[in-house]
């Protein structure tokens, strides 16, 4: 991984770990849902402390699930849903062991195109289509992992100068800008919901009529 200093957890030690450890970054990405992103990306550092060792895919994959869940749930919990996230992270590490010889960085280092990189990431436990695109954008923008077509694979999150996702967070100010964008998108979606609900019966009626 490139020696770029990430600024996601907004904590010096946690961000240093994310910057140098590919597995820590992947785990942070998995945790980044339904909780503040700083909390999510603090998770890998707190997990290393609770496990008493550096993060290792083979080690986590082979641990007793209940033991791992306990490490996630110990206050302060690593996530709002520590049990399910512990299971998801363990599934992630098993894929890394089985498909990438235990080397998480191989997921992107051996991808020859952006499309291939996106497919690989989307196939990982804990990554949907949008999160996979965001991670491709993060790799390309901040870690200089730029296989051919990476921006196209990242979609809108790969746009230069955007402030749409964690791929664009480089300091406290950009974090605020990303938060404002997400807030605006959430408000827009909320406004659109009643209109869509109102239009649904009419569309259903029209479809039924045309099917006669």
Go through each PLM region and give its residues.
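C-terminal accessory module of base-excision DNA glycosylases/AP lyases that mediates lesion recognition
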Residues: 1-15, 20, 114-118, 129-212
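Structural motif
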Residues: 13-24, 35-37, 79-84
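Short, aromatic/basic-rich helix-turn unit that serves as a nucleic-acid recognition element
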Residues: 26-30
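Short alpha-helix boundary/capping elements
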Residues: 34-39, 51-52, 97-100, 143-144
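Alpha-helical ds-nucleic-acid-binding substructure associated with the helix-hairpin-helix region
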Residues: 51-122
């Amino acid at each position: 991984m490139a020696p770029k200093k990430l600024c996601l957890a907004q904590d010096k030690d946690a961000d240093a770990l994310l910057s140098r450890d590919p597995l820590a970054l992947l785990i942070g990405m998995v945790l980044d849902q339904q909780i503040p992103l700083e909390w999510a990306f603090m998770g890998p550092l707190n997990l290393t402390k609770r496990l008493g060792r550096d993060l290792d895919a083979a080690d986590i994959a082979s641990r007793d699930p209940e033991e791992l869940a306990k490490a996630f749930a110990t206050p302060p919990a690593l996530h709002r849903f520590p049990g399910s996230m512990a299971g998801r992270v363990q599934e992630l590490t098993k894929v890394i062991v089985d498909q990438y010889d235990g080397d998480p960085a191989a997921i992107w280092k051996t991808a020859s195109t952006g499309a291939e990189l996106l497919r690989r990431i989307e196939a990982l436990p804990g990554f949907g289509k949008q999160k996979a695109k965001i991670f491709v954008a993060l790799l390309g923008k901040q870690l200089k992992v730029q296989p051919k077509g990476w921006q196209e694979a990242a979609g809108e999150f790969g746009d230069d100068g955007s402030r749409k996702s964690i791929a664009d967070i480089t300091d406290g100010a950009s974090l605020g800008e990303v938060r404002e964008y997400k807030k605006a998108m959430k408000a827009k979606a909320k406004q659109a919901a009643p209109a869509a609900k109102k239009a649904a019966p009419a569309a259903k009626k029209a479809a039924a009529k045309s099917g006669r």
